[in-house]
From Swiss-Prot:
NCBIfam families: lacD, PRK04161.1, PRK12399.1, PRK12858.1. Belongs to the aldolase LacD family. One of its GO terms (biological process) is D-tagatose 6-phosphate catabolic process. This is Tagatose 1,6-diphosphate aldolase. Its EC number is 4.1.2.40. PANTHER family: SULFOFRUCTOSEPHOSPHATE ALDOLASE. The lineage of its organism: Bacteria, Bacillati, Bacillota, Bacilli, Bacillales. Pfam families: DeoC. GO terms for molecular function: 6-deoxy-6-sulfofructose-1-phosphate aldolase activity; tagatose-6-phosphate kinase activity; tagatose-bisphosphate aldolase activity. It is an enzyme of class 4 (lyase). Keywords: Lactose metabolism, Lyase. Pathway: Carbohydrate metabolism; D-tagatose 6-phosphate degradation; D-glyceraldehyde 3-phosphate and glycerone phosphate from D-tagatose 6-phosphate: step 2/2. InterPro entries: Aldolase_TIM, DeoC/FbaB/LacD_aldolase, LacD_aldolase, Tag_1.6-dipho_adolase.
Length: 326
């Protein structure tokens, strides 16, 4: 792998002794505010958001190889994390402009790769919405944007984790049958593209290439993919990149995410870990708002611990070391 010694050392700080990235994702901002707003009438406060992130960091980072936080609400949590837990910091603004076509990327204006590194980050993470079938006038802007961030990370000698979320402006519901049919190609082609050396990406954070709710044996209703077809999409995904890649949990339940990882492994996907967010901690949100800090802490120590512990056991059996990828 043509990475600098410093980048390799940094990725080692983000992974466990087996070279697997078992990372906890809690850089949610807009999505977290919406989750909190379901359980209270007033707007969630900055203090509320920061404190929930601190609670999760205090209770769960001892079981994670690293944690992904945002520099807007997550800095107190970064200080509260376990001393052996690595730190990724998000560089993108939350969400996207729903009134503009193309879901164009945007950095947090007060931050740079240099500043994130100075804040203690072992890696910079950036989220990009990408549709390989979008107009080239949109996609060329996105490619140039990622080239800039990649160059920044090379200059600062800090790993660049690129998170790619696929979409199609013509299919508003990405949980639909229509999107499930086009998802494998969109996910795998985007991975192939951003593996090109010009982007200087070190680790890809990606979706699984199918919607498991439409896979034979997992589906409760309509089936879009047979088990064999779904397995082939995972194989194709593994072949789409030479880079280390990790899966995001995409807000599915802890159980479904774990079953998905087992399926990926059986299909031959040599993925290198996860950045798992809501599947681990989402249940704490309602408890925190309705019953307070102590009750949320208790939830994290019991259910939250079980979620992350079960996930770690599954990763031990399914994920492979990022050092094996060339």
């Amino acid at each position: 792998m043509s990475k600098s010694n410093q980048k390799i050392a940094s990725i080692e700080q983000l992974s466990n002794n087996e070279g697997i990235i078992s990372a906890l994702a809690f850089d949610q901002r807009g999505a977290l505010k919406r989750m909190m707003a379901k359980h209270q009438t007033e707007e969630p406060t900055v203090a509320q958001i920061e404190q929930l992130k601190v609670l999760v960091a205090e209770e769960l980072t001892q079981y994670a190889s690293s944690i992904l936080l945002d520099p807007e609400y997550g800095l107190p949590a970064s200080d509260a994390r376990n001393k052996d837990c690595g730190l990724l910091l998000a560089y993108e603004k939350t969400g996207y402009d729903v009134n503009a076509k193309g879901r164009l990327p945007d950095c947090l204006v007060q931050w740079s790769a240099k500043r994130l590194k100075e804040q203690g980050a072992n890696a910079v993470k950036f989220l990009l919405y990408y549709d390989v079938d979008d107009a080239e006038e949109i996609n060329i802007q996105k490619k140039a944007y990622i080239e800039r961030i990649g160059s920044e990370c090379v200059a600062e000698d800090i790993p660049f984790f690129l998170e790619v979320l696929t979409y199609d402006d013509n299919i508003p519901d990405n949980g639909s049958v229509e999107f499930a049919k086009v998802k494998p190609r969109k996910v795998n082609e985007a991975m192939k593209l951003f593996s090109e050396p010009r982007f200087n990406v070190d680790v890809l954070k990606v979706e699984v290439p199918v919607n498991m709710k439409y896979v034979e044996g997992f589906a409760e209703g309509e089936v879009v993919y047979t088990k064999e077809e779904a397995a082939q999409h995972f194989k194709n995904q593994d072949a789409a990149t030479h880079l280390p890649y990790i899966y995001l949990s995409a807000g599915v339940s802890a159980e479904l995410f774990q079953e998905t990882l087992k399926f990926a492994h059986e299909a031959g996907a040599k993925f290198n870990g996860v950045l798992c967010g809501r599947a681990t901690w989402s249940g704490a949100v309602q408890v925190y708002i309705e019953q307070g800090e102590d009750a949320a802490r208790e939830w994290l120590r019991t259910t939250g611990f079980k979620n992350i512990d079960d996930l770690n056991k599954v990763l031990k059996d399914t994920a492979t070391s990022w050092k094996q990828r060339k």
